[in-house]
């Protein structure tokens, strides 16, 4: 794969074989995030679990103290008082069957989070094949199937993110933008890592955190020593 000149220049700024403390790694990531736009800072964590086993799944939600830097559009499936509550809380789209039809007919996905009240799941369930692959299907585990509509909308808007292990045993999450600066990004990073560590399945054997890599949208990956996540 051919790499651009900027990418190759960035590789000279650090030793890519070395594992750094999170503090040192963030310095390098910010130094190499030199594109002309506000790059997203991403985290990839490889875990010592086998995602093929139901008792070794790792997923959860966490509210980033400084948000993701992204404007989050929220769609809520609710009726009556709960629909009014969603609108008052700042939901971008609120509706019922008519929104299900819109999604089915128009392949409409102009939103980042979908919340539904439990009584709407019979209707929303018809969207499983459309919303599921995009990670948008409301789910009680992530707090998006709930009667506490106001709380769910406000948390989504505040930067609540869901993390889940993929088939390769890796969790990928964005932790903010370059413009946040080092301290805020480190706080977001450590908040996510703390949540992932606390999500360790009882069935997981051996080393749980195998590798931690920080990168910017256009920059190379920088390894964090799993023993120095909070340094």
Swiss-Prot record:
InterPro entries: Ribosom_uL1_bac-type, Ribosomal_uL1, Ribosomal_uL1-like, Ribosomal_uL1/biogenesis, Ribosomal_uL1_3-a/b-sand, Ribosomal_uL1_CS. One of its GO terms (biological process) is regulation of translation. Keywords: Repressor, Ribonucleoprotein, Ribosomal protein, RNA-binding, rRNA-binding, Translation regulation, tRNA-binding. Coiled coil: none annotated. GO terms for cellular component: large ribosomal subunit. Signal peptide: none annotated. It comes from the Bacteria. Disulfide bonds: none annotated. Pfam families: Ribosomal_L1. GO terms for molecular function: rRNA binding; structural constituent of ribosome; tRNA binding. Belongs to the universal ribosomal protein uL1 family. Part of the 50S ribosomal subunit. HAMAP family: Ribosomal_uL1_B. Binds directly to 23S rRNA. The L1 stalk is quite mobile in the ribosome, and is involved in E site tRNA release. NCBIfam families: rplA_bact. This is Large ribosomal subunit protein uL1. It comes from Caldanaerobacter subterraneus subsp. tengcongensis (strain DSM 15242 / JCM 11007 / NBRC 100824 / MB4) (Thermoanaerobacter tengcongensis). The gene is rplA.
